[in-house]
Amino acid sequence: VALHRAAYQLYTHRKRLEHSGVLIVAPTRGFLRYIERVLPSLGETGVVTLTPGELVPGVRADTHDCEDVARVKGSLAMTKVLRRAVKARQQVPKGPIDLNIDGVHITLTPGDVRAARAEARATGRPHNHARTTFVRAALDRLVKAYVAELTRLERPWAEEDRADLLHDLRTNHDVKVALNRCWLPYSPQSFARSFFASTERLVHAAGEHISTREITLLHRPKDAEWTIEDVALLDEIAELLGDDDTAAQREQDKARTTERSNLEYAEKVLSMIDSEGIVSAAELAAQVGARRDSRTLAEKAAADRTWTYGHIVVDEAQELSPMMWRALMRRNPTKSFTIVGDGAQTSSISGADSWDHALSPFLEDRAS
């Protein structure tokens, strides 16, 4: 049924789906391998096939937690627990932090950090994105303290030096360590490993949302293998964190380097042929760059956790937990789904015994 529905969607809504594709989710890789063989033979290449344990790129989980742990991890209460856990990593120091800037001593105060944190949180952006605002706001306050101390020490400086002073602070080891301790960027995996390995952090994040027994069930070694239930939590954490801006900056730098390399290559090619009036070096470089990304739509979508699909087909859907449904709904905000399964046959303690129970948290806006 799932295979036929995917083929039907691709054929009937080809125009709408050619740039977004279809995601097929099934519990076993064996069934998905069959789909991967059949659909290309029908000329369909815009399909991504994933098990629930593969929803987050870079993570592949194929084992389940025990029933009690799976029930806790699959509960929507985890959204509140994880949100509290992320906010707890935006810390105000208990006391002032002394900083040495080329022999000039200044202080980062709890008040400075609290004000910078408030500015960052007010943006409403995910943790890693809001960190940019936090760092800027904290540095603005440190520059003022730095200037005041330079003035007190009667060291020469001018207003036009402020950008250089800001650079000195931004690159200073003490400053970087202090700001990282207050608001460190994380990947979903590094955050989850440290969070679930810490009883103290679990207790703080739990609040009134999960019980003491459930906290004990969630606690795990830092090097534990990912489970299928973890994948939905990693997806939620990724939403709360956002991309690491430092990693994004590295990608931008890499892209600029590649662009320069393409341009240099194009200029060399054009210098060897008579191309006047035909194509510019920049145009040729753009063509080279376009050719280098020869991935199919399915390959691009599978590598992008934030990809929005035109349609999602879910096989054995009764096995999915509320948190896994939340992860899937995120990948199709229009809620264009084909759901294949039987609630009476669920074998998962966190699965659905009725479709109303499984889907009502996500379909309130569609109620008639």
Question: Model-derived features: where do they sit?
Answer:
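Walker A/P-loop NTP-binding motif
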Residues: 3-15
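Conserved P-loop NTPase-based nucleic-acid remodeling module centered on helicase motor cores
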Residues: 43-110, 117-118, 137-138
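Conserved helicase motor core of SF1/SF2 NTP-dependent helicases
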Residues: 15, 20, 29-73, 241-242, ...
